Amino acid sequence: MTESPTTSPATGSGAAAPDSDAPPYRYTAALAGRIEGSWQDTWAKLGTFNVPNPVGSLAPTDGTPVPEDKLFVQDMFPYPSGEGLHVGHPLGYIATDVYARYFRMTGRNVLHALGFDAFGLPAEQYAVQTGTHPRTRTEANVVNFRRQLGRLGLGHDSRRSFSTTDVEFYKWTQWIFLQIYNAWFDPAANKARPIAELVAEFDSGARSLDDGRNWSELSAGERADVIDSHRLVYRADSMVNWCPGLGTVLANEEVTADGRSDRGNFPVFRKRLRQWMMRITAYSDRLLDDLDLLDWPEPVKTMQRNWIGRSTGAKALFAATGADGAALDIEVFTTRPDTLFGATYMVLAPEHELVDELVAPAWPDGTDPRWTYGAATPGEAVAAYRRAIASKSDLERQESKAKTGVFLGSYATNPTNGKPVPIFIADYVLAGYGTGAIMAVPGHDQRDWDFAHEFGLPIVEVIAGGDISEGAYAGDGLLVNSGYLDGLDVAAAKEAITARLEAEGRGCARVEFKLRDWLFARQRYWGEPFPIVYDSDGRPHALDEAALPVELPDVPDYSPVLFDPDDADSEPSPPLAKATDWVHVELDLGDGLKPYSRDTNVMPQWAGSSWYELRYTDPHNSERFCAKENEAYWMGPRPAEHGPQDPGGVDLYVGGAEHAVLHLLYARFWHKVLYDLGHVSSREPYRRLVNQGYIQAFAYTDSRGSYVPAEEVVERDGRFFYRGPDGEIEVFQEFGKIGKSLKNSISPDEICDDYGADTLRVYEMSMGPLEASRPWATKDVVGAHRFLQRVWRLVVDEQTGETRVVDGAGRDLPTGTLRLLHRTIAGVSEDYAGLRNNTAVAKLIEYTNHLTKEHRDAVPRAAVEPLVLMLAPLAPHMAEELWLRLGHTTSLAHGPFPVADPAYLVEDTVEYPVQVNGKVRGRVTVAADADRDTLEAAALADEKVLAFLAGAQPRKVIVVPGRLVNLVV
């Protein structure tokens, strides 16, 4: 138990805020503020929410073992913006605090802490504008966030808080990067292994090179190239999303559907650049299959499944001849190999690596003008087309109804029938999916049909059952016009043609994924530096772990070189390149002192959040990112509790669904690599996920659509008015996400000032289910405040400040109070455990109203103390204060939470509706164990029922036990 002060510094001898109309000891905002500040100081001083670890600096100093019954609760940590919190931000934080407080009161060892995701573009942009170092701005924002969050009374272990920008934190982000860099994925073992083991296998001859070369005959540079090609982190000349307006490349997930940057709304262009990539695709199957092990919302699982996008089909090779006469194979992946005989043309992504080799020097005789893009030569047409589609996002390219493309002037050979098929490029084919090339079967794929119709290409039916003159037929049927496949159904045809392709060496069965490798570099300043240097030949070398952390240097200018947002031909120039003294170093990497250059990119903002849950378990460890014992205790699998397939992970993770295919996917990938390498015992980072809804607020626009300050709008007769500089005008109400842009932001500080933090907590939890979005209405906050005032009055005399309870045993309570008490305990316990805080509030209000009505003079201690304990997770400051006033000398933060007596949950009596010919005409109350005869007699004796019977005798009496009595006349 945590000791409490014997008298409250907040209210020991003080009264409520001065108000001539209010009783001196009424629970007001001023009194709430003093109570809340006092208890927050007490909790901090006593370390009330500090939780022990099995080992390390946070382990019990007396050697006491940690409790077996643990609970790890985590919020998605905030980005500390300059605007601070609005009332929408605390929704999830309060919900998890209620959850953690409840289970802490039941005796569980609860870890609940909050850090800050502090790297990112906003702080960098502010630094560019003001010349202030991003760290200065970020640290000031963190201080303000901690102040605002502190006012809410969140029961966090503050010793475990950190920012991703802390050098002590990002040292381990860099360390994990090195673990991934120095690993490779072994398909046979379906797991990552240390790269040293791959080298050992090549050295011993246990593994051969795929290209047939002899490992022992390779030069050191050639061996390094082979090893680098296997690493889970690698450099590649890849098509990337280049944003000149931001001066950096973006991940696919950071580009909007209309081909613009998610931040800043700048145009984004597809461009080939050499970038760091993470081989997340190696984990596609495991990332997909292990979703079944997780207690996550099904929509989030569906989003991840769709993003990973597993497809089963076949690879087929189409022979072609390059412009220089060289023989080429164009590889396609198709989920419909049964339709190969219907392939009448091919389409490559404009970025496909073979396009330039396949472009003919001139148009073949008789080329359809529709195929030429209005250009004199295929080369000119390809260049013009690439420029035209450079700023289109993948989604735009796939969803565009207008089909465009360019003929390359060359042909490939259909491997099934030997017929030549023209080769096009078109924007609806993406380089990032499959092989970046498709066989076009217009008879049975609508996009191919549309393209063929637009360009006058042949359409062949190979599956009977539809009218391909009107559109593609995608249904089942028997194969036609397909040689040896004729007469087979689709399934049999797939199997037969795949076998034939394999036998002829022109294809094989294949599984493909939509998921692409993770672009893991940004041309920014405010991010984690890479622990990588380059030698004079430009070859990358990983730094030794002893060289970590690689700290960010100060630079005179924090901005990347920004370009005209429409300049697609511009090239990245990172700000770290300006720190020449930092970039150019002399190091001994095992072969003597040599000059090297540091990598001038930084990691994406997702890096720190990909592992931060692990650091909460051991935040001060300077030797490891976390001790294995601490990770195993807080996150290890618990099959006895969660089932034999339990992957482990955080017990409850709460945050927004918008991170489904970003943070959550990246975190799962990093965690699986760490698991494979033996660094963690849990297979997944988050066992259970809950997505909280959003708090929305009314916003108001004038006749031009411009937003006006919501707090200055008044309502009259259902219409809304705003008094601006030109007088009062009518404005129009709409719902919107709370924020600065809609001028409807409301600070939690305002609500705490006007009502107190406990009122804010109760109000937000009472607004509806956690997962649902809900409208904010400041005028409704007073309802939560009045509820807390009623609870206060049950214990404290508003005139004298004295406690107004009477002692007595619980069994002496009136039966109605006793039954309602235990029903409330049972219901509230279930609600807290199920994150149904809104219904818990409703039950507490019902019980409070009952006590207020039935015990006007003084409330029995046995009735009110359980109420105070039940209220504690929701309104902890008031509950602590009332608990102290009730004579207790220990904090209730660690319980005990009341336990319902099952004997009082069984009703003595049951009310039955009585129907006459199926319509309810009366109600009777009988003993819960009443038999059929007793029920029938009671129904026939009811005055209202007798009036409807009017002397008639029922022909039949139907009794449904526990539900109703029906008299048929």
Swiss-Prot record:
Disulfide bonds: none
Tagged with keyword Plastid: no
Catalyzed chemical reaction(s): tRNA(Leu) + L-leucine + ATP = L-leucyl-tRNA(Leu) + AMP + diphosphate
Superkingdom field: Bacteria
Gene Ontology cellular-component annotations: cytosol
Entries under PROSITE patterns matching the protein: AA_TRNA_LIGASE_I (PS00178)
Keywords assigned by UniProt, alphabetized: Aminoacyl-tRNA synthetase, ATP-binding, Cytoplasm, Ligase, Nucleotide-binding, Protein biosynthesis
Compartments (UniProt record): Cytoplasm
Pfam families (alphabetical): Anticodon_1 (PF08264), tRNA-synt_1_2 (PF13603), tRNA-synt_1g (PF09334)
Annotated stretches, region: Disordered: 1-23
Gene Ontology BP, a term: leucyl-tRNA aminoacylation
Positions with a binding annotation for ATP: K740
Transmembrane segments: none
Motif, 'HIGH' region: chain positions: 78-89
GO molecular function terms listed in the Swiss-Prot or TrEMBL record: aminoacyl-tRNA deacylase activity; ATP binding; leucine-tRNA ligase activity
Motif placement: 'KMSKS' region: 737-741
UniProt-listed SUPFAM superfamilies: Anticodon-binding domain of a subclass of class I aminoacyl-tRNA synthetases, Nucleotidylyl transferase, ValRS/IleRS/LeuRS editing domain
Listed EC numbers: 6.1.1.4
Family membership: Belongs to the class-I aminoacyl-tRNA synthetase family.
Record's protein name: Leucine--tRNA ligase
Name of the encoding gene: leuS
